Amino acid sequence: MANLQNFSLEGKNAWITGASYGIGFNIAKAFVAAGIKNIIFNDINEAALERGLANYKEAGIENVHGYVCDVTDEVGVKALVDKIHAEVGQIDILVNNAGIIKRIPMHEMKRAEFQQVIDVDLVAPYIVSAAVIPEMMERREGKIINICSMMSELGRETVSAYAAAKGGLKMLTRNICSEYGEYNIQCNGIGPGYIATPQTAPLREKQPDGSRHPFDSFICAKTPAGRWLDPEELGGPAVFLASHASDAVNGHVLYVDGGILAYIGKQP
C-alpha cells in the first residue's frame, strides 16, 4: 500500500494554462484531491481570469494563483515565469492545456485563421515549456503534460489546422522527452476523447421529435464505451502523469477516449 504514496502531489506547485474552466479546471480539481500545494493558472484577459477565480472559489479550492497572460506572447510568458517563481515558488508540474479550434473547411480557411490555431495549440506549448524547463533542469526534476487530442492521430473534416497542431504537439511531447529525459524531466500527453461539457451540451440534447442528435448518435456508436466521457475522468490520468508513479513513463500520449482509437466500428 505504501506505493500509493507515489500518486501524491503533496508539496508540489502546478501551472495549468487556460484552466479557468473545462478540462484544465477539472485537472486542477484532481490535483487538489491529490494534495497539491498550489494551483497556478492563467487566462488571456482580466474578465476570463475573474471568471476562473470565481469557479475555484465556488469549488472551495484555496491556494490558487491566477494571472493574465497570453501564452503565445514569448516575452509575456517569460515574465510570468519569473513572477511565479518570485510569488509562488518553483513550477514542479506544467500542464499545457490552453487551446482553440476552428471548424472551417481547409479550402475556405484563411491563412491567419490557420496560423492562429497553430500558434495557440502548438507554438504556445513550446514557448511555455521552453520558459519552464531551465529551472527544472537545475533541480533535475519536472513533469510536463501536454493536452493532445484524438486528432493527434486521426483526421476529420473541417479541423485541418487543429489536427496539424495536435499532431505536432504529439511529436513535441516526444522530443521534449528525448531532449530532457536525462534531467529527470518527464513529458507526456493526454489525448481526450469526446467530453461532455457545457460546450457540447447542444450536441447531446434530445431533438424535438425525441430522437438523439445525429452527432450524439455518431459518437456513442463510434465509442466502445457507448457514451460521452465526463471531464472528471481525465483527472486520474493527469494525477498519474504528474506524480512519481509515472517517473518511468516518458514521451507517451495517454488517450482517454473510451476506446475510439482502438475501434473500427460495428458491422452494419
What are the residue ranges of the model-derived segments?
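Conserved glycine-rich cofactor-binding loop
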Residues: S20-G22
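Short, small/polar-rich loop/turn modules that mediate ligand/substrate recognition or access, typified
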Residues: V95, G181, Q186, V249-G251
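Substrate-binding pocket helix/loop in short-chain dehydrogenase/reductase
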Residues: P105-M106, E113-I118, F215, I219
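Active-site helix of classical SDR
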Residues: S129, A165, T173
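Alpha-helical segment proximal to the catalytic Tyr-Lys
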Residues: P134, S178-E182, D247
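C-terminal substrate-recognition "lid" of short-chain dehydrogenase/reductases
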Residues: E141, R227-V256, L261
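Residue(s) in the substrate-gating loop at a strand-loop-helix junction
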Residues: S149
